[in-house]
């Protein structure tokens, strides 16, 4: 949950912070297929009409970083050339992960372990978590998105769910929220993709 915290010193100085407090241990629903690799098992599950949560271990794209607007590629020419993050804060995937439409400090340990996929060819897909590219390139970059694949439903999240996870409470809570969403009846993606589009998205770099 989001908690406002204030500190005043002799009525002269005033500071205010937002603090995010998450449960230590939670049990998430598991009525879906969980995968770390896009492979034939994932394709078969989708063709059988199953729900799939794919958190790819290896994915093409740009490694993201959390940075304030000052540290942007307009002023500093350095990778990943991203100027911010746009979040669909009203999406039910965030039902148990309070967020605004921009990346506040609870996104630090998520974005520093994430990859933004280039989704230019997926014209109908709007990312749920989207990295904002510099105006020089203006690529459509997605960290999370969902789609209907035939009779199946797919949610892709490109953020490391394992590395240093004991030190990343926000990532644990985001995973919990996403897992419960994917397992729920609310997980009914509207936009459709074809298997060949996923194949191209995950094809090895030449």
List where the protein language model places each region.
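Short strand-coil-strand connectors
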Residues: 10-13, 148-150
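Short, small-residue-biased leader/transition segments that mark boundaries at the very start
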Residues: 2-9
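Short, charged low-complexity linker/loop segments at the C-terminal edge of domains
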Residues: 25-28, 183-191
